[in-house]
Amino acid sequence: MGNGVAAHRYFAHGQFETYTPIRWILGFLSTLGAIGPITFWVIQHKAHHLRADTTNDPHSPKYNSWFYVFYAWTFPQGNNEQEYLQDRYAKRLAVQMMRDPFYLFFHNHHYKIILTFSLILALIDPAYFLMYALAYCVDFFRLGAVNYWCHRSGYRNFETEDATTNNLLLGWLGMGFGWHNNHHAHPGRLILQHRWWEIDVEGYIGWLITKRP
C-alpha cells in the first residue's frame, strides 16, 4: 500500500485524485515504506520511465547487477541523485515539489517519522515492530523483483521502447505490481488489467479512495 498505491500510483503518476485526509494518510504510508522521501522516490521513478532500460535508467537490470537493482538504488549516494537534479526536468520537478508544504514536511521529517513509528510499535509490543519490519522486507523484495524480473522475463501486451514485461507470479502476489509492461505502456492508467487474469488489487484500492465529484 505505501509503495504501490501511495508512492507509485498516487505521488509518482497521479493516477487518481483523493481527499485531503487520505492524501496525508498516503504520505505517511509512503514514508513508512522507508525507500526514501517522497520527493526522491518521485524524481527517480520519473527518471526510470523517461529512460527505461538505457544507461541513464536508475535501476535497469540491463546495465546493473541484481544487487543494485534490488537494493543499492534506494540510497541517494548509490544512484547519483545529483545527476538526476542536473537534468532540467528533474530539477524543475524537485523545485516544484519542495515549494509544497506537504512534500516539504515529509521530506524534512522522513526518518523521524519512521523512527518514531518504530519506537511506538516496539514499546507497545515488540511483536508489532517485528511485523512492521517483516512487511517492509516483503514489500522491499516485491519492488526489487519487479524492477529486475519484469525487465528480463515474462510476456508483453504492448510493444514499448523498453524491455518491460508482465510477470504472472509478481502480478498476482504483488497485487498488480507485476503488470509492468501494461504500466509502462500506459503510466497514467490506474487499473492495469488488460486481460481477464491480470487482477490489479492496487488499482482497485486506488479506485475506492478516488475523490468523487
Each model region followed by its residue ranges:
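Non-catalytic, topology-defining segments of multipass membrane proteins
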Residues: M1-A145, W149, W179, R189-P213
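Flexible secondary-structure boundary motifs
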Residues: W149-Y155
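Active-site-proximal inter-transmembrane loops
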Residues: R92-P101, R156-W179, H184-H186
